[in-house]
Amino acid sequence: MSYKKFDDADLKFLRDLCGTERVTARDEIGEDYCHDELGGTRARPDAHVKALSTDEVSKIMKYAFENAIPVTVRGSGTGLVGGAVPLEGGILLDLSGMNNFLELDEKNMTLTLEPGVLLMDVGKYVEEHNLFYPP
């Protein structure tokens, strides 16, 4: 796929949607967002956006699709396979702020949570309900 070059209009859209405090661009983006725990693979996104709701994620993804802007999704950056590294630039969609537990269904032994929840927090949460999560 051929991607469009990220520009100031794209940055404005993101900042209007999420606010300037949750959108950083280009050289403002810290090095931690240019790699994951794999090491060796580095790339800088054009924008880093910290989404806080599924509505924001949906609007960002729709805009990116309509404008041919690549999106790399990131949780907490602890991955070991390079999947959270923005190799094509574009938008780094940070979901670490979406860190709520939504539902524990003890009958079916399922847990519904947002993508920013850390595994160590899953363990603590289920222990409070006399359950065990083997990571």
Could you describe each region identified by the protein language model?
Residues 1-38, 66-69:
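N-terminal accessory segments
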Residues 14, 40-71, 95-135:
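N-terminal glycine-rich flavin-associated loop
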Residues 28, 38, 85-86, 90, ...:
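Short capping/connector residues at structural and topological boundaries
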Residues 36-42, 63, 83-93:
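Glycine-rich loop at the start of a catalytic domain that most often binds anionic cofactors/ligands
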Residues 57, 80-81:
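Short glycine/serine/threonine-rich phosphate/pyrophosphate-binding segments
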